């Protein structure tokens, strides 16, 4: 493992995002970042890490964005497959250009006009190292019925040990000063293809005492493509949540503690509908909880859900 970065951190903000074969949605995201940047006293830098690099039109689109927006853009190709390598490349670049804060967003999302200003405001108000914010799903027209269940596709405020806990990189701001003594790479390569490495990263920061905060005003939108606009996909996602949870729980407290939790959650399934935690539909809530528990047991028996596997054929999508 490499030594901690000791380069001084200076003032400034960079917006980072990783992309993989999503040129059109990447351009949409970048254009909305430019709108959000107008609310700031100084322009942010933009860091785009392409985890593919085979399509020259992506780099050309990023360059065109920089020219029309006037924002400084750092475009980097990361050939190592997996989301961990791409995220690490974002933070390596941020360290090289010397910014104080990094905000991250996914390439299939687009921010609200006040996104960056509200993230920075929450950081200042709470003196937080990490600030998270909501992600709101945007369904295709033929899946309007799913709006009733939108929260299953959303990212909302979470707590850990009674404190705000940011658990994913799809919408957050971080103070780079808190990372000066963190060993590199920040995101564990063991989670590069499976996903879940962002939760591992944030749990490390949380248990080392770094304060986290939440800003409801810094919301962003996420496109839900037809391939994700179904309960079949959501059940798979809940399986993945349970599967990955066992992996990071085992890192924290060891396998026996994680197995004990799985036993407890399995027994709770018999009375889970009584809790009515999902008022939209008791049955849907139970099925999703069942899939989460099923994913946990699969992990205990060595089955790792791989979210970022590369396509076997050109044009094929794998869990995206």
Regions found by a protein language model. Give the residues of each.
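Conserved donor NDP-sugar-binding/catalytic core segment of glycosyltransferases
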Residues: 114-145
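Short, flexible, basic/aromatic active-site loop/helix in glycosyltransferases
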Residues: 133-134, 147-165
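Acidic donor-binding segment of Leloir-type glycosyltransferases
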Residues: 32-76
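Active-site nucleotide-sugar/metal-binding loop of Leloir-type enzymes
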Residues: 85-101
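Short beta-strand-to-loop acidic/aromatic patch adjacent to the donor-nucleotide binding site
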Residues: 98-110
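Acidic donor-binding loop at a coil-to-helix junction in glycosyltransferase catalytic cores
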Residues: 192-203
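Non-catalytic, C-terminal membrane-associated alpha-helical segments of glycosyltransferases
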Residues: 236-241, 253-320
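N-proximal low-complexity "stem/linker" segments adjacent to membrane-targeting elements
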Residues: 1-35, 41
